Swiss-Prot record:
Keyword Cell membrane: yes
Annotated S-S bridges: none
Positions of modified residues (Omega-N-methylarginine): 871, 882, 884, 980, 984
Family: Belongs to the constitutive coactivator of PPAR-gamma family.
UniProt keyword annotations, A-Z: Acetylation, Cell membrane, Cytoplasm, Membrane, Methylation, Phosphoprotein, RNA-binding
Protein name: Constitutive coactivator of PPAR-gamma-like protein 1
Biased composition (Polar residues): 403-418, 433-445, 503-512, 922-934, 1070-1090
Subcellular location(s) per record: Cytoplasm; Cell membrane
Main location (coarse class): cytoplasm
Highest rank taxon of the organism: Eukaryota
Organism this protein belongs to: Mus musculus (Mouse)
Length: 1112
């Protein structure tokens, strides 16, 4: 509604203003200096708003998008599009939406609600009919925007990302750089003064790839039909309703324009709810009203007349009306030409200089180098600010962003064809980045031309432990009341403004009581509010301030973000501490598959820890406290806000998620991860990525088992296998993912178009969506860790096609096709699938979960309001003594387990075998694989049974196996009495649930807690673990475990051998780290470890020997 309906109004009611055009003809005409007798002087330069054009860049609404995406088909379409533009004298520049846009958050919330309903309609349609849904239900496949961005970079199409206000930046960028036209589909663009405005929805490429057509909007025809001067468009847009002044606040004004005699007046109030007039009726009525305004410069008089019937917040509405007029006036006025903000010509990747004055976030305080001290750089005047001041407080300095273009045009600069072989495997941002680190004296040194000489991040403790300069500003005490912190306005101002969103309006529903009171005093009955819940300003929640980020790291992040070289989440996490997660296709009635937002939340938690260098900063703090003979400080949790919508979670409020640090090793700071050039730095990047994906195993780095271009695929599948709840992947589903990734048909999109799917599998569609959500998080983690995997090998067209996966899954699940037939009879391909499956399952063992446990809620964190979030599951109170082993207890599994506070950050470990059962240990190296089957072993120390505190039975213990620690206390199984409510056989075991809604809360753990699945109990110290490792022989064996219960292996087949070893099938007790020594090469692939001098054969032999030694 409101201004967003104006674009549809043009399509339906102004047919003469929509003219079909062929872009190749425009590129040969007078617009670019061409004619009948002369060739065009310049290319037709068009700016494309990718946010409105994603479905067209994807290739259109063809039906196979529901299966997770046909990425090679998309790649072929974009290749044809780039070829057609190059041959037709057209230069495209694609602008992606990388802004958080808190001011438009209420629009995003409504859109997520609609897409969530669409997702349920899609699932229901596929379940009932087994056919693809209609194109009107098109829901972009997960990760589509990032895939399109990487594909455009591959085809040398220039890209950029917005950073604050997407619409303002697109409009300003279009004018500032002399683009001939804008390809988009948004009312904000239609109401601004753009010479040539083309439709993104009508953009079509002919089958032969020679004709590129679209529709052009003639805005002077629209103004003629509305009988409205274009100079009055800003007031017209402000009175239609927009993100600043919503149409709910203008509803009474719109109804007053229609009058009581209007045929629709009877619809004004229905069942005490607000009913807005139809959009086309409102547009005509507002146009008539604006046409009759005598003085358009007197905004006070206009606002007084518009809000004459308002009963409350009139002053606030007047202010927001003026802001809305100013917002659209800034986009409508022609801008004086400014020197490009980034490049001399034609300013790719930059921010517009025309953006209205932006109030900087109070959390940011980045020292800028003095521009006057560098006379070679021209000062760019910024509107509403002082000359030479950038429009944003954290803009990159001019000298750093001026590339040396001497002797090279932009096409040559952005071309990847001339990059040497080693350069093609460098991170994406280093190829076109102006930072030249090769000339630096040290790997962590950054050229002073790019970074300011005085960095507030340097301190005497930064080099401790060889970590280099940290990305945190040391020595500053963070407090809630500190000026410049990341706290919301509550921390600094009036409590009534505590949840105000920057640039957004006050929610109309927040004043429902005030409207009701005013209705008794006024003569005009007010229209009831449309919304029954708080919106916009009342959605947000105040969080603790983020740790200050060093200017060097922030400028690098901003530079890569603007140039489209980095995942957009990263910059917003570093600066604002919040992200928005889009809806994917999920069946909310299916209890077997978790929501993607919850499934991959631990990945994001560890990425947050990497971005803020939690491990290193806390380690330094503890060392300083130890030197000063002080107790370790109690660290405040680092909270990130995640806006998401899924089953049981509304997007109206954010979830507070805590950042986590790796316990196995100290991850280096962000500056070293991103800018370090040493071999150790490259190894640490890879280890950090694998640790985030819970895939830190040697086999993942063995190219003989996992090719580099399939590493993301295997990491995501391994992560899905480790989910601690209900099984996600069955054996045949895992084989289907691997078989389609190795199929030659993957790279034949034409053959895949001819492939017929008789009946779509609803579970397969959801698995595809979950997998692509994992790929999305893998791209996020890869960029956050410094791109250890080359971007060419991360793209999903290297390893996934949704339609091909559906075909393989139907054969594997319904027809029970053997693996060799699943691989089209190719024995070599089947052998590769076996190796990849072994690598994915390395170190994982599976056992059946017997009973769910009821858990009492733990106390909430002190700074969260108790009424905001539901409390989480917490631990069961401990017993007196250590239990030996039992089944059916779930914690978060995987290789890294979870950190649980016993007092702030005095942690013990909760680890798990395969992610289904947890165990307590002092370190990961102390985990064993004894008694990991589904049958519970008899405790060797015996036990007794109590009912209501009375002993009613005893039993003797079994003989101790090897590798024991000595006697254990007698086990007590209580039924009823003080311990009632627990399942029988479960002895006081704390279980920490990290997958859930709301913020992550802590439960208390105790050293007396029992072990799980027959594993050693919690080690009180590292010395105890070391003694056990020395005393333990390598002869402990674990029986073959049937994985049929978890859907990974057939019941009649043994556990596959790892790394091709022979002998009795075994499941290793634990997975050793792939990079347990940072000085070792991180990969036997020379592309991933260019500085290694050993031969591939010798490195593979060493890796295999290490794995075999571990197994023995």
């Amino acid at each position: 509604m409101g201004v967003q309906g104006f674009q549809d109004y043009i399509e339906k009611h102004c047919p003469s203003a929509v003219v079909p055009v062929e872009l190749q003809k425009l590129a040969r005409g007078s617009l670019v200096g061409g004619g009948r007798q002369r060739p065009p002087q310049t290319p037709l330069r068009l700016l494309v708003d990718a946010d409105n054009c994603l479905h067209r860049l994807y290739g259109g609404f063809y039906t196979d998008w529901v299966s997770g995406g046909q990425w090679n088909h998309m790649l072929g379409y974009l290749a044809a599009l780039a070829k057609a533009c190059f041959g037709g004298n057209i230069e495209l520049f694609v602008f992606f939406n990388g802004a958080l846009e808190k001011a438009r958050l209420h629009e995003w919330v409504k859109r997520q609600g609609n897409e969530r309903q669409t997702a349920q309609q899609i699932v229901s349609h596929v379940q009932n009919k087994g056919t693809p849904p209609p194109k009107v239900w098109f829901l972009p496949p997960v990760c589509m925007a990032h895939c399109i961005r990487l594909a455009l970079i591959r085809f040398h199409v220039k890209v950029a990302q917005s950073i604050e206000d997407h619409h303002q930046e697109v409009i300003g960028f279009c004018r500032e750089n002399g683009f001939h036209g804008l390809v988009a589909y948004d009312s904000d663009y239609a109401l601004c003064n753009i010479p040539y405005y083309f439709s993104a929805h009508a953009l079509k490429l002919s089958r032969n790839g020679k004709s590129l057509t679209t529709s052009q909007y003639l805005m002077h025809e629209v103004a003629k039909q509305l009988d409205l001067n274009p100079n009055r468009f800003p007031i017209f847009a402000a009175l239609l309703g927009n993100h600043i002044l919503p149409d709910e606040d203008l509803a009474s004004f719109h109804w007053s324009l229609l009058g009581p005699e209007h045929p629709l007046a009877s619809l004004k109030v229905r069942a005490h709810q607000l009913v807005l007039p139809p959009c086309d009726v409102v547009i005509k009525a507002v146009a008539d009203y604006v046409r009759n305004i005598h003085d358009t410069s007197d905004l006070d008089a206009i606002a007084k007349d518009v809000f004459q019937h308002s009963q409350s917040r009139t002053d606030d509405k007047v202010i927001r009306f003026k802001r809305a007029v100013g917002y659209y006036s800034a986009t409508s006025k022609p801008m004086p030409f400014h020197p490009p903000h980034y490049l001399a010509r034609p300013n790719p990747f930059g921010m517009p200089g025309m953006v209205p004055p932006y109030v900087p976030p109070q959390m940011l305080n980045i020292p800028q180098t003095s521009l006057q001290a560098k006379p070679a750089v021209p000062q760019v005047p910024s509107p509403g600010g002082t000359p030479g001041q950038a429009p944003y407080p954290y803009s990159l300095s001019e000298p750093a962003l001026t590339l040396d273009t001497s002797g090279k045009n932009l096409t040559e600069q952005n071309s990847y064809s001339n990059i040497p072989h080693e350069g093609k495997h460098t991170p994406l941002y280093e190829r076109s980045s102006p930072i030249n680190l090769a000339q630096s004296g040290s790997p962590n040194h950054v050229d002073s031309a790019y970074f300011p000489g005085s960095s507030t991040s340097s301190s005497s403790d930064n080099d401790e432990g060889g970590g280099g300069a940290t990305n945190h500003i040391s020595g500053n005490k963070i407090g809630w009341e500190k000026t410049g912190s990341h706290a919301e306005p509550l921390a600094r101002g009036d409590p009534g403004d505590q949840v105000k969103v920057e640039g957004s309006s006050t929610a109309s529903s927040g004043s429902q009581l005030a409207e009701g009171k005013g209705s008794h005093m006024g003569t005009v009955q007010p229209i009831p509010c449309l919304l029954s819940m708080p919106t916009r300003n009342h959605m947000d929640i105040t969080t603790p301030p983020l740790p200050p980020v060093a200017p060097e790291v922030l400028r690098v992040a901003e530079h890569r973000h603007k140039k489209g070289l980095m995942y957009p989440y990263i910059f917003h996490i570093l600066t604002k501490g919040e992200i928005k997660i889009a809806v994917s296709i999920e069946d909310e009635a299916n209890k077997d598959l978790p929501p993607a937002a919850l499934l991959y939340r631990p990945v994001r938690q560890y990425v947050y820890g990497v971005l803020f260098s939690l491990a290193e900063s806390r380690k330094k703090t503890e060392r300083l406290a130890f030197r000063k003979n002080r107790l370790p400080p109690e660290f405040s949790p680092l909270i990130i806000k995640e806006w998401a919508a899924y089953k049981g979670k509304s997007p109206q409020t954010p979830e507070l998620v805590e950042a986590l640090a790796f316990r196995e090793w100290t991850c280096p700071n962000l500056k070293r991860l991103w800018l370090g050039k040493a071999v150790e730095d490259k190894n640490r990047r890879m280890r950090a990525f694998l640790a985030c994906m819970r895939s830190d195993t040697p086999a993942m780095l063995n190219p003989a088992n996992v090719p580099t271009h399939l590493m993301v695929l295997c990491c995501v599948l391994r992560y899905m296998v480790q989910w601690p709840g209900a099984r996600i992947l069955r054996r045949q589903e895992l084989d289907a993912f691997l078989a389609q990734a190795l199929s030659p048909k993957l790279y034949e999109p034409d053959q895949l178009q001819e492939l017929k799917i008789d009946n779509l599998d609803p579970r397969g569609i959801q698995l595809s969506a979950l997998f692509m959500s994992g790929v999305d998080m893998a791209l996020f983690a890869n960029d956050a860790c410094g791109q250890p995997i080359p971007w060419e090998h991360c793209c999903p067209w290297m390893y996934f096609d949704g339609k091909l996966f559906q075909s393989k899954l139907l054969k594997a699940s319904r027809e029970k096709t053997p693996l060799i037939d699943l691989c089209d009879g190719q024995a070599e391909q089947a052998a590769k699938v076996e190796k990849m499956r072994q690598s994915i399952l390395e170190g994982l063992s599976f056992s059946r979960q017997n009973h769910p446990l009821p858990f009492p809620p733990p106390p909430a964190l002190p700074f969260y309001p108790a009424s905001v979030y539901p409390r989480h599951f917490g631990p069961v109170p401990p017993s007196q003594g250590r239990g030996r082993g039992f089944a059916g207890v779930c914690g978060f599994g995987g290789h890294y387990g979870e950190t649980v506070a016993t007092g702030p950050y005095r942690a013990f470990r909760v680890t798990a075998a395969s992610g289904h059962c947890g165990a307590f240990s002092g370190s990961d190296s102390s985990r064993t694989s004894k008694s990991q089957g589904g049958v519970q072993p008899i405790p060797s120390q015996g036990g007794k049974l109590e009912i209501a505190g009375t002993v009613v039975g005893h039993w003797a213990g079994s003989r101790r196996g090897r590798g024991g620690r000595g006697p254990f206390p007698l086990q007590v199984v209580s039924v009823g009495g003080p311990a009632r409510g627990r399942p029988r056989g479960v002895i006081s075991t704390p279980v920490i649930r990290t997958f859930g809604r709301g913020g992550r809360y802590y439960g208390r753990g105790y050293k007396s807690q029992g072990a799980i699945q027959g594993r050693p109990p919690y080690a009180a110290s590292a010395e105890e673990v070391a003694k056990e490792l020395k005393s333990k022989s390598g002869e402990s064996k674990s029986s073959a475990v049937s994985l049929a219960e978890n859907g990974v292996m057939a019941e009649e087949k043994p556990v596959p051998q790892l790394n091709g070893s022979t002998g009795d099938p075994r499941v290793p007790s634990h997975s050793e780290s792939a990079l347990n020594n940072d000085s070792k090469p991180c990969n036997t692939n020379p592309h991933l470890n260019a500085l290694s001098t050993d031969s591939a054969c010798r490195r593979e032999a060493a890796l295999e020997a290490a794995v075999l030694n571990k197994e023995e």
